[in-house]
């Protein structure tokens, strides 16, 4: 399907589908389409958000979603993290935006046995020697559908959990490589553990509706919580979430990085944080779109 919307192409489409620009990210320009009218409208939106004025039309996947994060050092390949991605479905036809990542993924054993060898073979064939890479997968009936690879640090910032638990910082490694040609870690094989030594981790995303932020409650208090290793806050009181930020990662108020010893402790901590968080707009309305349902864990 292209911008000409030829009838012979349109009649082949099986709904629902996801339409997205070929050269954008963070959910920008993406739409869920359930019929032909939505498909044409969504495609035009994708084109408007594409530098190349091109878009993709894909089957909309309603299944598990994971991300695998790799480290490369002198041609050696390390799976450094793997997480389940949980997205909100409460924003109409907008692209599902992540509201939490849970480490390690419930699919970690199958992925490592079945998919990791295939990925490693591909990486070697591509000649990747140094760097970091994340790639996401839809998991449906034990089949893995790869999408959205990124040969770079990620907005999710998995390196925060990795540095806290395994003791190596991808940011420093990449700076070392840029300046010296070496990633600068001599014992990476010993330090790297994609299962995080049995710890249970979560990156909790706080998404906001559009509007002027009057009050933020519960974020500042997290600085005193020993289970919260970092809070990445992107909006402050008095700032505005614009309409065009909703439905992509620009609507993220904060990402909260949590480390617990057990799944029970993690669930308890997430529920505690949820009960304390609130963001109020100038009309005294709650702005938080959705928070992780811990019954899914």
Give the residues covered by each predicted segment.
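A short glycine-rich, hydrophobically flanked beta-strand micro-motif that places a catalytic Asp/Glu
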Residues: 58, 129-141, 187, 288-293
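A conserved helix-loop-beta module that forms one wall/lid of the active-site cleft
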Residues: 1-29
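Conserved ATP-binding module of the ATP-grasp superfamily
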Residues: 16-19, 30-63, 93-102, 120-125, ...
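Protein kinase-like catalytic core scaffold
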Residues: 17, 78, 145-148
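ATP-dependent carboxylate/phosphate-activation module, predominantly the ATP-grasp catalytic core
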Residues: 59-66, 70-128, 132, 139, ...
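Short, well-ordered beta-strand elements within core beta-sheets of diverse protein domains
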Residues: 31, 59, 103, 163, ...
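Peripheral (often C-terminal) accessory segments that flank ATP-dependent C-N-forming ligase machineries
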Residues: 7-9, 176-297
């Amino acid at each position: 399907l292209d911008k000409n919307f030829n009838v012979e192409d349109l009649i082949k489409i099986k709904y629902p589908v996801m339409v997205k620009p070929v050269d954008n990210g963070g959910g920008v320009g993406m739409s869920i389409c359930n019929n032909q009218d939505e498909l044409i409208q969504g495609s035009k939106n994708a084109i408007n958000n594409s530098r190349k004025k091109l878009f993709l039309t894909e089957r909309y996947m309603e299944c598990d979603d994971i991300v695998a994060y790799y480290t490369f050092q002198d041609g050696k390949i390390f799976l450094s993290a793997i997480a389940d991605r949980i997205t909100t479905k409460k924003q109409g036809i907008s692209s599902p935006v992540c509201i939490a990542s849970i480490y390690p993924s419930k699919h970690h054993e199958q992925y490592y046995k079945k998919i990791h060898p295939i990925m490693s073979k591909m990486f070697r064939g591509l000649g990747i020697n140094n760097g970091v890479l994340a790639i996401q997968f839809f998991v449906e009936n034990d089949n893995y559908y790869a999408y959205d690879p990124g040969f770079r640090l990620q907005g999710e910032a998995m390196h925060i959990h990795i540095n806290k638990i395994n003791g190596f910082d991808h940011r420093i490694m990449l700076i070392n490589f840029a300046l010296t040609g070496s990633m600068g870690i001599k014992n990476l094989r010993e330090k790297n553990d994609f299962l995080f030594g049995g710890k249970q981790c979560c990156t909790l995303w706080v998404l906001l509706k559009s509007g002027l932020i009057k009050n933020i409650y519960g974020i500042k208090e997290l600085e005193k919580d020993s289970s919260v290793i970092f809070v990445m806050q992107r909006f402050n009181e008095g700032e505005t979430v614009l309409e065009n930020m909703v439905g992509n990662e620009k609507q993220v108020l904060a990402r909260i990085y949590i480390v617990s010893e057990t799944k029970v402790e993690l669930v308890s901590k997430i529920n505690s944080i949820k009960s304390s968080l609130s963001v109020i707009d100038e009309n005294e309305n709650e702005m938080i779109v959705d928070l992780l349902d811990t019954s899914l864990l």
